[in-house]
Amino acid sequence: MVGGAPEQRQLFLQPFLATKGAPLAAFALTEPGGSANVGSPSPGEGVRTTARRVGDSWVISGRKQWISAATGWNGEGADLLTVVCRTDANVEPSRGISIIAVPRPDSGLIFEHAFDTLGHRTHLMPRFRFDAVPVPAGNLLGQEGRGLQLAAESFAGSAALVGIFGVALMRAAFQFALSFAKSDRRGGIHQIIQHQAVGYALADAKTTIEAARALSWHACRALDTAAPGALELAIHAKVFGSEAAVRVITNLMQVVGVDSYGHELPLAGLLQDAMALPLFAGGNIGVRRRQLHALMLDPAYDDLATLDGICLAENVP
């Protein structure tokens, strides 16, 4: 739990460490209008969900959407929401946005709409609102006004994970396409893998998969060891892995042919899932490339920092 004090981690994370049940947690940042502008200084833009201090409580009001797992298992809400909200609308976002942990409330959490998505259909990403939901003041994570910084830390980890998602989808598509190419003749006398065009397409796909895998692994290791270039590596893993997944799966569908367009084969579904990766957990254009641009604009930027901690074969534990 990024920003959480030890006692908060004990309180909120204990159910997730238990051997019984299957609690769900969700990170609530995105609002109607998108999340690329979360740092807008105007209270009418960016983060518009508010948390108002009333006695020993924060009272949360506002809308969120595209929040994975927010509905929970039964449509009544996730067991724990961490909510990005404005705690002070009179200062700039770098000092006026906070994150508050919200256990599933008895009332005031209202689900308004379930999006009908192209892929990732095993869980809902709804639009919902907080209707004056009170939570204890002690549920504030970290210091008041540090919400954007904490969100950025959280999204570093999620960036690397999206790179891994891309690798997983590409691997599944490659394994199917390779097996298909080795067994199917498409009406000819040879398995289609004997054709150079098919073999080269498979080779290119495997090269990209291995590159994405290595980059994602390096990013995760850098995050685990707090290496200097960890944030940049994580963003590269997200951008490269997510966009590679769409491209590689599309190319593998061409190896298989028109049958891959139907849901009788797995490739169409894998592509539908892959198409979400450049868009969520910080869109590649609206958020992630902008982050990379900002890193490179910094006068202290070191383009070799991403090499720090790189593992040589003899040093791998």
Regions found by a protein language model. Name each.
Residues 23-53:
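A gly/ser-rich beta-alpha-beta helix-loop segment of oxidoreductase catalytic cores
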Residues 65-72, 157-162, 277-284:
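Glycine-rich phosphate/pyrophosphate-binding beta-alpha loops
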Residues 111-210:
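Glycine-rich beta->alpha junctions and the first turn(s) of the following alpha-helix
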